[in-house]
Amino acid sequence: MSSLVLQCWKLSSPSLILQQNTSISMGAFKGIHKLQIPNSPLTVSARGLNKISCSLSLQTEKLCYEDNDNDLDEELMPKHIALIMDGNRRWAKDKGLDVSEGHKHLFPKLKEICDISSKLGIQVITAFAFSTENWKRAKGEVDFLMQMFEELYDEFSRSGVRVSIIGCKTDLPMTLQKCIALTEETTKGNKGLHLVIALNYGGYYDILQATKSIVNKAMNGLLDVEDINKNLFDQELESKCPNPDLLIRTGGDQRVSNFLLWQLAYTEFYFTKTLFPDFGEEDLKEAIINFQQRHRRFGGHTY
């Protein structure tokens, strides 16, 4: 007798029927935790079946339909995704590699995510590349990152995306500052996805620089105290784009780490244990599906 113990989501039928001498498509499913196959090969069949069965003993704790394209709602697509790209160092250490090998995946993986996001109709990605606190890391690692960030132009200048950099640029190496200026100038006319990279950025820093700018304008008679409101403050922040709808953090930690503190007030958060170098198309779609299943009230009530 074949046996199947599972939790199942997003199948075209709420019930699963097992019969002998038929096959189960493992390619259509993900999240298999336990699998026992006694002396029988597993036959791959067409995807999308609403009846699945097998002639072997299959035990699983979680079975989930993987074909996420049909589950995405274009009308509920987030316009702006904030991304904390965490887990590069752990990815390298888990493989017995130097941490630099993990960091090398940052821009290629980010470009991959931008390509996927563009096809899905997402308009803005804001990616946290280097925080104001990351200077505390070992000098060798920081030096490597500064050199690696100079690959920005080669990676994105011909990608079709518009690139903007936020953060305190004056503290960065001069060669990197020139690379940033060249990349922003080269891509400013691109009509595709807007990629905002937070480099030497922190939420505290952004709020403080906005406050100082407003105070300076008030002291110089350029605005009255009564003119100061949320909209004015928004304009003084470096991000200068609509606030994120969805924040995705890879690597398992569940905190914002001083990222976009003002802008995340009503953002939906999604945390995944997947390390950033392993974060791919299905992971992104899974995060978006999770986002689309939420009811955003923005502090109000809907009945």
From Swiss-Prot:
Keywords, in A-Z order: Chloroplast, Plastid, Transferase, Transit peptide
Catalytic activity: 2 isopentenyl diphosphate + dimethylallyl diphosphate = (2Z,6Z)-farnesyl diphosphate + 2 diphosphate
GO cellular component: chloroplast stroma
GO molecular function term, any single one: (2Z,6Z)-farnesyl diphosphate synthase activity
Transit peptide extent on chain: 1-45
Catalytic residue list: D86
GO biological process, one term: response to cold
Coiled coil ranges: none
Subcellular localization(s) per the UniProt record: Plastid, Chloroplast
Keyword DNA-binding attributed: no
Keyword Cell membrane belongs to the record: no
InterPro entries assigned: UPP_synth-like, UPP_synth-like_CS, UPP_synth-like_sf
EC number: 2.5.1.92
Role noted for this protein: Specifically forms (2Z,6Z)-farnesyl diphosphate (Z,Z-FPP) from dimethylallyl diphosphate (DMAPP) and isopentenyl diphosphate (IPP). Also able to use nerylpyrophosphate (NPP) as substrate. Involved in the biosynthesis of several sesquiterpenes.
Similarity comment text for this entry: Belongs to the UPP synthetase family.
Name used for this protein in its record: (2Z,6Z)-farnesyl diphosphate synthase, chloroplastic
Organism field: Solanum habrochaites
Record gene name: ZFPS
